[in-house]
């Protein structure tokens, strides 16, 4: 029987010895099982794996069939922005805190991953956002996000006055500390903390969630994922930024606008066969258990 995966990439930015131990275990275990393994360069250096085939995230995206990301959701988000450009499936081993995107338990990773490598897994596509800071006489600054794009002050907190246009039609104006534009994947992250709705991953929707608005009538808004969102500013006298997944910041200057739309790329995320989104919500958010 043909294997669904032949070349496997090992990805992550370990901050703890336990995460490094998981990387090392996976490398030796996958190699012993006969898989071609490509390990991210930084991990190979930290583990002193001198003879291991190494590569960048882009190399792994181009050459591997499956990327195993070891770490927390932050590691997954950073890897996803690169790996989403390639035809590669991605799965995560949780060495972080909540682990909404990293399903595999590190204590049982071998058995769970063995089932996945045999073809027993669930697959889904998570769409991403693309953010542009639109400049008059210069190229746009562009980045992508799998969780959210956030409009926020720079170094000093201050009120922001802006208008929101959806599909080039005026939707609303707002005075607030900022605005969170979240995907369904990001609806359980920063957006949730700000009072935004939880969107199941299969929804083709985007949530717009105000941050500390100056009026009680400002409420979260859910729109179609095909919509284009444009932010216009009355006057920028203080630092202003948009951030993507809290990892990449793009400054916004006077006279510039922000455009946010669905990216042409998506993350091919896979899960163990017994994965349940609602079980994940229940366990991560501490929801009540079944009564009967």
Curated annotation (Swiss-Prot):
Cysteine-cysteine disulfides: none
Recorded catalytic activity of this chain's protein: NAD(+) + ATP = ADP + NADP(+) + H(+)
Gene3D superfamilies xref list: Probable inorganic polyphosphate/atp-NAD kinase, domain 1, Probable inorganic polyphosphate/atp-NAD kinase, domain 2
Residue intervals passing through the bilayer: none
Domain of life (superkingdom): Bacteria
Residues noted as binding NAD(+) in the record, renumbered to the chain: 73-74, 147-148, 158, 175, 177, 188-193, 247
Pfam families: NAD_kinase, NAD_kinase_C
Cited InterPro entries: ATP-NAD_kinase_N, ATP-NAD_kinase_PpnK-typ_C, NAD/diacylglycerol_kinase_sf, NADK
Main location class: cytoplasm
Cofactor entry: a divalent metal cation
Protein name per the record: NAD kinase
Keyword tags: ATP-binding, Cytoplasm, Kinase, NAD, NADP, Nucleotide-binding, Transferase
One of the record's GO cellular component terms: cytoplasm
Active-site residue numbers: 73 (proton acceptor)
Function: Involved in the regulation of the intracellular balance of NAD and NADP, and is a key enzyme in the biosynthesis of NADP. Catalyzes specifically the phosphorylation on 2'-hydroxyl of the adenosine moiety of NAD to yield NADP.
Cell compartment(s), UniProt: Cytoplasm
Gene Ontology annotations of biological process type: NAD metabolic process; NADP biosynthetic process
Family of this protein: Belongs to the NAD kinase family.
GO molecular function ontology, one term from the record: metal ion binding
EC number from the UniProt entry: 2.7.1.23
